[in-house]
Amino acid sequence: MTTPMTSTDRIEKQVTLRAPVSRVWRAIADAQEFGRWFGFTLDGPFTPGKTMKGTFDGQVDEAAIIEAQKKMGVPTSGVKVPSGSTVLCTVERIEPERYFSFRWIPYGIDAEADPEREPTTLVEFTLEAVAEGTRLTIIESGFDRVPAHRRARAFRMNEGGWAAQVENVRKYVDGA
């Protein structure tokens, strides 16, 4: 895994997966498969313009999240532990076996996030066939629009989150 570009506005992760583009595409663009490696159960298929709702698999534990914040050197904050369904994302664009994107509130479980007013970030997945399998690039951008009091925390928590999710998708696809 490499991190080709990181700034204060953009997180980029890249990984080469030992699977054909068609397999990686299913893991990314099929809502059920996406949920399996990402840790959410989603309420339906990904459709451009549709807002997806999901529930966390397992327990979202405030103490564990605060501990993760400390390990990342992020100023700790309270956490809104979701009950029931939580808006996860609004699908932007789907280009089969090449590109998938959605918008969401970055680090949306932060107690200081205001879901009514918070600007969203754009999450993009780009797939490219390479000799070893598929190069997957994940970019999340738009952090400079996040309110200043949350920006650094949201960026660092999502930076750590994407590092973990790249490993999750690798294990999911390589093990399939």
Locate each region found by the language model.
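Short beta-edge strand/loop motif at the mouth of beta-sheet-based domains
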Residues: E12, Q32-T86
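Amphipathic alpha-helical segments
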Residues: R18-W37
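Short, solvent-exposed aromatic-acidic interface loops
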Residues: R103-D110, I139-V146
